[in-house]
Structures are given as C-alpha cells and as structure tokens.
C-alpha cells in the first residue's frame, strides 16, 4: 500500500523575515531536486512558495513577515533511499536557513515525519486531543463484529494492544489498569460475589480468579472480542477465556442491561460490581450525548444489584478532562440512592496519559 510521508521544518527567526532573500537562497536547493517553483505573494502577509517534482513529491514554504518560516514536504513513503533523500533535503534547507538568517534563528523545530495512509496506522489521539504515535509494527487481528471493529496491534513497547472502534482499550503491558479498576490491591475478594460488566479482554477476570472469590460473573456482549483476546492477548487473560465456565466464574455472552434488570428483579446482589464498559464521555453536554444516558442507566442498575456494603469500580477518563469528570461526579449525585465516591489517578502505560478511576459505594443507612 502506497503511503505519504509528511515532514515539517519550522524556523522562528529573531527578526522579521526577508522573504525575497529566503526564496532566492533556497531556490538552488530545490532546483537540485528537480523541483519547479511557484510563488504567491501577499503585500502584508508574506510569501507562499510551492515546489513540485515529477515524482509526485512537493513542498510548501510559507514565509510570514513577523519571522515564522514553515516548510511542509510530502513524498511517497516508498523505500530507504527515498527517506534518506528527504532527510538530506531537510538538512540542506536547515543549514541554508541558518546561513541566510545570519545566526538570528531563534528556534528550529523539526518533528518526526508523519506517515499517512500506510498499511499500519500508528497514530491515535489522546482523550484530550493530542496526537500520539505508537511503535506499531504489525496488525495481529482486524475483524468487524456486529457491534464494533476489533483490532489487535503489536507494539514493541507495550505488546499486543486491543483497539475497539478506534479507541485504545488495553495493552498487554497494562496490568496497572486492571489493578486500578479492581481497587488497587486494597480489597479482599476471598469468598465474594463479583459482577464484571464488559471486560472482554479477560484481564480483570484473570486477576480476580487468582484471589479465590466465591463466584465471578462476567457479562460481555461481543463474542468476537473474547475470541480475539484469548488467542492474541494471553499475557493479559491467561487461559480464563478458553472456557466460558470455570470453578469460580462464568462468562455470559449477553447485553448487560437486560441481565442487570433481571438480577435487580430477582433481588440478586454482589459484593463488587466492576464496570469495564466505557470511559466517561468526552462530551460535556449530557443532554445531547446518548452515552451519558447509557452511563446513568448502568450506574442506577449497578447500585440496585450492589450490596449495601459493596463497592462499584469503574474507569473515568483522562485526568485533563476536568469538566467531563466533574459532570460524571454530578451524575453520581442523581442516582436513585445516595452514594459516596473516591478517585485515584493511575499511569496506564499504553494510554500515554494519566487516567482517573472511581470507587463508588452506598451511603450508610441512618
């Protein structure tokens, strides 16, 4: 698959930019590459020069009068030689710019190139909108279930990473996530009844069954998530997903909402409810985002099946999303029963951002 390599080079000059001098000084470098120049001039807004090559590569050079000079270079990400030629061109431009500015260059910024349209996508936004490039080197699994797209990609640092509908869910490196959503080692699960909502990667189930619970019930809607993870995420799930029933656990392939309603109607209660379905929505308009309705429904139903002295664990979102997290905490105050909560900030390796986890419990009856 053909991909495009997008390289950037930024200069912040210590003085106003002499656009004509820069264009003249760089012209020979682009000509050596066989590139044709086209220049657009604004009276008060500087210059835009475009350089095109017969091989399909091109460069845009934007010169702002206040001293900012930006170069964008796009070429085929074809072979090692092509990458070396691009790096050589950028090196020559950087050296020439330093010469032309007579050491008045205040700052030079050269970012790693972005490869767009490649067979392996390595870029994801963080929850708060920053771009992250992962060291992905292999697509291990890529299937569409009736509910979502399921990808498992291999990272050199983090091992296999589960990605659901474009969202990074869990990597084999992320035991910190699993421990945090289980109470960070502060809980005694011995002889306890536990309900897991979601958790198709098997990480939570794998860790809890080691702690000798009475029974763990996991409700996961997507069989294909389980199938992919039991084959390609075994450092996370061990062998617990090989069978849907074990000595102290059962996995139900069902929508959790009808199951929660059934348990509530039957009066069934759990010592722990662990919600591993979804993060707190990024949207700060609960009245416009159906995910908030889903979240409130899950919260209310979970409280109905939680014992009076039980605990409810869930993830929040990125620590920087303070407004969304505050809205979530407001929702906790609107449940059918009064609750209290605490939160913990945890570094989950593959998320590349700090993550908030919540513990919720019912207020003691007077």
UniProtKB/Swiss-Prot annotation:
Reactions this protein catalyses: S-adenosyl 3-(methylsulfanyl)propylamine + spermidine = spermine + S-methyl-5'-thioadenosine + H(+)
Pathway entry: Amine and polyamine biosynthesis; spermine biosynthesis; spermine from spermidine: step 1/1
Keyword Iron-sulfur among UniProt keywords: no
Binding positions for spermidine per the UniProt entry: 177, 201, 351, 353
GO biological process: spermine biosynthetic process; spermine metabolic process
One family name in Pfam for this protein: Spermine_synt_N
Domain of life: Eukaryota
Annotated residues for binding of S-adenosyl 3-(methylsulfanyl)propylamine: 148, 220, 255-256
Keywords: Acetylation, Phosphoprotein, Polyamine biosynthesis, Transferase
CDD domains: AdoMet_MTases (cd02440)
UniProt note: phenotype after gene disruption: Mouse ES cells lacking Sms display normal growth rates but are sensitive to antiproliferative and DNA damage-inducing drugs.
A GO term for molecular function: spermine synthase activity
Residues that bear Phosphoserine: 57
PROSITE patterns assigned to the protein according to its UniProt record, in alphabetical order: PABS_1 (PS01330), PABS_2 (PS51006)
Keyword Amino-acid biosynthesis found: no
Active site: 276 (proton acceptor)
PABS domain: residues covered: 122-362
Enzyme class: transferase
Residue numbers of N-acetylalanine PTMs: 2
Function: Catalyzes the production of spermine from spermidine and decarboxylated S-adenosylmethionine (dcSAM). Required for normal viability, growth and fertility.
Free-text note regarding domains: Composed of 3 domains: the N-terminal domain has structural similarity to S-adenosylmethionine decarboxylase, the central domain is made up of four beta strands and the C-terminal domain is similar in structure to spermidine synthase. The N- and C-terminal domains are both required for activity.
Protein family (similarity comment): Belongs to the spermidine/spermine synthase family.
Subunit record text: Homodimer. Dimerization is mediated through the N-terminal domain and seems to be required for activity as deletion of the N-terminal domain causes complete loss of activity.
Name of the protein described by the UniProt record: Spermine synthase
Organism: Mus musculus
Taxonomic placement: Eukaryota, Metazoa, Chordata, Craniata, Vertebrata
């Amino acid at each position: 698959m053909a991909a495009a390599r997008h390289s950037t080079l930024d200069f912040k000059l210590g003085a106003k930019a002499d656009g004509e001098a820069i264009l003249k000084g760089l012209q020979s470098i682009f000509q050596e590459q066989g590139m044709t120049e086209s220049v657009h001039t604004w009276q008060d807004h500087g210059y835009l020069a475009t350089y095109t090559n017969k091989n399909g590569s091109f460069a845009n050079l934007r010169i702002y009068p206040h001293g900012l000079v930006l170069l964008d270079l796009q070429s085929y990400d074809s072979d090692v030689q092509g990458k070396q030629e691009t790096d050589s061109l950028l090196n020559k431009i950087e050296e020439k710019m330093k010469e032309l500015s007579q050491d008045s260059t205040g700052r030079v910024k050269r970012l790693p190139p972005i490869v767009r349209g490649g067979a392996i996508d390595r870029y994801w936004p963080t929850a708060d909108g920053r771009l992250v490039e992962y060291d992905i080197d292999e697509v291990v699994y890529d299937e569409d279930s009736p509910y979502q797209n399921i990808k498992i990609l291999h990272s050199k640092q983090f091992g296999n990473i589960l990605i659901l509908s474009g969202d990074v869910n869990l990597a084999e490196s992320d035991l910190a996530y699993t421990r945090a959503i289980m109470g960070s080692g502060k809980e005694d699960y011995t002889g306890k009844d536990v309900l897991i909502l979601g958790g198709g990667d098997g990480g939570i189930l794998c860790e809890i069954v080691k702690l000798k619970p009475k029974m763990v019930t996991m409700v996961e809607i997507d069989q294909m998530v389980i199938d992919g993870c039991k084959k390609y995420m075994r450092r996370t799930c061990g062998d617990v997903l090989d069978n849907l029933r074990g000595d102290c656990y059962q996995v139900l392939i069902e929508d959790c909402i009808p199951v929660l309603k059934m348990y509530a109607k039957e009066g069934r209660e759990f010592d722990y409810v662990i919600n591993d379905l979804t993060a707190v929505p990024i949207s700060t308009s609960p009245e416009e985002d159906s995910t908030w309705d889903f979240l409130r429904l899950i919260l209310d139903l979970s409280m109905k099946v939680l014992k009076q002295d039980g605990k409810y664990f869930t993830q929040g979102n990125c620590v920087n999303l303070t407004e969304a997290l505050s809205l979530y905490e407001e929702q906790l105050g609107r449940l059918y029963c009064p609750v209290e909560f605490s939160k913990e900030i945890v570094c989950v390796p593959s998320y590349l951002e700090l993550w908030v986890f919540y513990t919720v419990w019912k207020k003691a009856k007077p």
